[in-house]
């Protein structure tokens, strides 16, 4: 792949990220690639997605140096510009980053020499009953202990605004969209609709809609299912609902999920990939849909999602079932699958650590 412009998204609060950034800049200088930095820790400019693309130099490739939070910032930038994104792993429990920091130079060489595969990930987008805004009194609270607060999403100029379908927002989510309570002493009351039909009215601390990628993030912590990132689905999960039905609901990508704040409720915050982006009042609603655009993430080898799930979540075996030694794979990793299984995705080579 020809790389002319590289956008470098760095968590400047981590010394190892700063050191890896120097390696990336050196590589760019050696190969005459223009490199533009965005420091998600120290850069306090509030930019919408298009302004961030311009600030990053309209990159062909976005490289993130940090954990999953930094990757989400880079993914937002890459999705807005249809660029590739490569995540360098400097986090502790993340699932999104691909390459260890020590291998950053060889990873960039692999991208340049086209020794890569593209992992296409589903994204979410929104429509809303009105424009989203963050009240000024909430901004200091939202920024506490974090980097800069992202601005409310703009209205997409290329989409039709309709009284029935609401205002199209120029925003995407790789992990999740969350509607959560603002008041400490009361839950938020929300009507949840699937494909326009009422599923149930909830009283809960929060309600979230996740992608398969986001199923191992907030949704997982709230008791939601683990979904393969290769699947196409929307995962709805209530957080601490005060009702008998507390299960997640998994819908098809063409079955949108809408959340309407009920008149008996207080206001609710809208967070997109962990960032507060607006507040809804009683009567307001958001609709969450599968986005027409996709995230294109760089993969340098086969993705062992379930091996990473076992490792990162520190999964343990039942004492009565555990065997001595390391567990062997069920299928051989040295031969290809037989013809009747050729349509399946099976790892046929050891995963490099």
State the predicted function of each range.
Residues 1-81, 114:
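N-terminal glycine-/serine-/threonine-rich phosphate-binding loop
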Residues 16-19, 26-30, 201, 212, ...:
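Catalytic, metal-anchored helix/loop core of enzyme active sites in primary metabolism
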Residues 68-70, 93, 213-215:
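Short glycine-rich anion-binding loops that position phosphate/pyrophosphate groups of nucleotides
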Residues 82-98:
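Short, acidic/small-residue loops that bind anionic groups at enzyme active sites
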Residues 95-205:
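Catalytic core of DAGKc-family lipid kinases
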Residues 179, 195-198, 244-353:
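ATP/nucleoside-binding phosphotransfer catalytic cores, i.e., glycine-rich phosphate-binding loops
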Residues 187, 197-245:
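Gly/Ser/Thr-rich active-site loops/lids in small-molecule metabolic enzymes
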Residues 192, 214, 270:
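Short aromatic-centered micro-motifs
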């Amino acid at each position: 792949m020809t790389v002319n412009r590289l956008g470098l998204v760095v968590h400047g609060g981590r010394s190892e990220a700063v050191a890896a950034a120097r390696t990336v800049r050196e590589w760019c200088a050696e190969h005459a690639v223009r490199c533009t930095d965005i420091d998600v820790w120290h850069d306090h400019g509030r930019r919408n997605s298009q302004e961030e693309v311009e600030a990053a130099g309209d990159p062909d490739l976005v490289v993130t140096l940090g954990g999953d939070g930094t990757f989400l910032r880079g993914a937002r930038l890459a999705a807005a510009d249809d660029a590739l994104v490569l995540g360098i792993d400097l986090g502790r429990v993340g699932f999104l980053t691909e390459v260890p920091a020590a291998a950053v130079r060889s990873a960039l060489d692999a991208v340049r020499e086209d020794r890569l595969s593209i992992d296409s990930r589903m994204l979410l987008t929104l429509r809303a009953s009105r424009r989203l805004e963050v009240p000024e009194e909430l901004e200091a609270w939202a920024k506490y202990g974090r980097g800069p607060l992202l601005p409310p999403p703009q209205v997409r100029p290329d989409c039709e605004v309709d009284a029935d379908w609401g205002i199209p927002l120029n925003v995407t989510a790789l992990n999740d969209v969350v509607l959560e309570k603002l008041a400490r002493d009361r839950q938020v009351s929300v009507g949840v609709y699937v494909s326009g039909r009422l599923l149930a009215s909830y009283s809960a601390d929060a309600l979230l809609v996740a992608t398969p990628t986001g199923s191992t993030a907030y949704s997982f912590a709230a008791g939601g299912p683990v979904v393969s990132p290769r699947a196409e689905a929307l995962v709805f999960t209530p957080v601490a609902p005060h009702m008998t039905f507390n299960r997640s609901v998994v819908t098809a990508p063409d079955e949108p999920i809408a959340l309407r704040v009920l008149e008996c409720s207080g206001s609710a915050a809208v967070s997109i990939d962990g960032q507060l982006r607006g507040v809804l009042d009683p009567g307001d609603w958001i609709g969450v849909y599968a986005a027409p655009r996709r995230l294109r993430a760089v993969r340098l080898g086969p993705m062992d999602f379930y091996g990473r799930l076992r490792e990162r979540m520190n999964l343990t075996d039942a004492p009565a079932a555990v065997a001595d030694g390391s567990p062997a794979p069920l299928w051989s990793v040295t031969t290809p699958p037989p013809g009747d299984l050729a349509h399946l995705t099976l790892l046929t080579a050891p995963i490099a650590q």
